Curated annotation (Swiss-Prot):
Name listed for the protein in its UniProt record: Replication restart protein PriB
Keyword DNA-binding tagged: yes
Function: Involved in the restart of stalled replication forks, which reloads the replicative helicase on sites other than the origin of replication; the PriA-PriB pathway is the major replication restart pathway. During primosome assembly it facilitates complex formation between PriA and DnaT on DNA; stabilizes PriA on DNA. Stimulates the DNA unwinding activity of PriA helicase.
GO CC entries: primosome complex
Source organism per UniProt: Photobacterium profundum (strain SS9)
Gene this chain is encoded by: priB
GO molecular function, one term: single-stranded DNA binding
The UniProt record lists the keyword Disulfide bond: no
Assembly, per entry: Homodimer. Interacts with PriA and DnaT. Component of the replication restart primosome. Primosome assembly occurs via a 'hand-off' mechanism. PriA binds to replication forks, subsequently PriB then DnaT bind; DnaT then displaces ssDNA to generate the helicase loading substrate.
Keyword line: DNA replication, DNA-binding, Primosome
GO biological process, one term: DNA replication, synthesis of primer
């Protein structure tokens, strides 16, 4: 089964860094994507807001420069997660992060 998503956008919320009990570093942030796509030969404005998590020491260096307003491209797989409040959401588990342009 294929499960791969690549999305570019702007960091919309300050990244939150944490570490699992096993010592695995995590970085959670929200990516806001806006673009125009073609559907049925017509232009369509597209918008999405997705939670992203990157895990592992290999990605830790790449997340150091992430901040609100930074244009970023992420790739990875998506998974459904249920929060403590019982509300579910799709989360992009990034295995590739590329800063396109800083927010300065």
């Amino acid at each position: 089964m294929t499960n791969r998503l690549e999305l570019s956008g702007v960091i919309a919320k300050d990244p939150k860094r944490s570490q699992s009990p096993a010592g695995v570093p995590h970085c959670h942030f929200v990516l806001e994507h806006r673009s125009y796509q073609r559907e049925a030969d017509l232009p369509r404005q597209v918008y999405c807001y997705i939670n992203v998590v990157s895990s592992g020491k290999g990605l830790q260096v790449l997340t150091q420069d992430l901040a609100v307003g930074v244009h970023t491209k992420v790739a990875g797989f998506i998974s459904y997660q249920t929060g403590r409040n019982g509300i579910g959401k799709l989360v992009l588990h990034a295995d590739h992060i590329e800063i396109i342009c800083s927010g300065d």
